């Protein structure tokens, strides 16, 4: 495999569309990357929980916000507000939701999260 690879989110390898969600995935070999666009009114508990069936999100997220605003509340009590330009890590055991009236666009680079997020059994 080539030492340098690229793919475009404009032509994703896979697309997932749970309620108020557009997840576009590209497979770069050892890494899967995702562009996640979530609409106003989106929350993990209302839009993704019905798909995956767990009490909280069990994915590990590593990414950055491109546009919009997002709030994360972790089971350990920690909470963060994210906006454009913010990089984040969020460990399993959390809920999250869009803040405000514009979509939130995030790029994620954790291979496991990108491969399994918003995907039913």
Predicted regions located by residue number:
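Glycine- and acidic-residue-biased ligand/ion/polar-headgroup-sensing regions
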Residues: 50-76
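A short hydrophobic beta-strand segment most commonly corresponding to one strand
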Residues: 35-36, 89-90, 95, 100-119
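Detector for glycine-centered tight turns/loop "hinges" at secondary-structure junctions
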Residues: 20, 41, 77-79
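Short beta-strand segments in beta-sandwich/barrel cores
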Residues: 43-44, 68-73, 96
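A short, N-terminal "cap"/entry segment at the start of jelly-roll beta-barrel domains
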Residues: 1-37, 45-46, 121
């Amino acid at each position: 495999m080539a030492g340098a690879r690229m793919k475009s989110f404009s032509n994703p390898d896979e697309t997932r569309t749970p309620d108020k969600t557009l997840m576009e995935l590209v497979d770069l070999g050892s890494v899967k990357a995702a562009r996640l666009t979530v609409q106003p009114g989106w929350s993990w508990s209302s839009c993704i929980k019905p798909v995956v069936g767990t009490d909280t999100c069990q994915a590990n997220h590593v990414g950055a916000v491109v546009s919009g605003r997002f709030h994360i509340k972790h089971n350990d009590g920690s909470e963060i507000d994210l906006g454009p330009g913010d990089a984040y890590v969020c460990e399993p055991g959390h809920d999250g939701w869009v803040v405000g009236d514009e979509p939130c666009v995030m790029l994620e680079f954790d291979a496991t999260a990108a491969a399994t997020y918003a995907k039913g059994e």
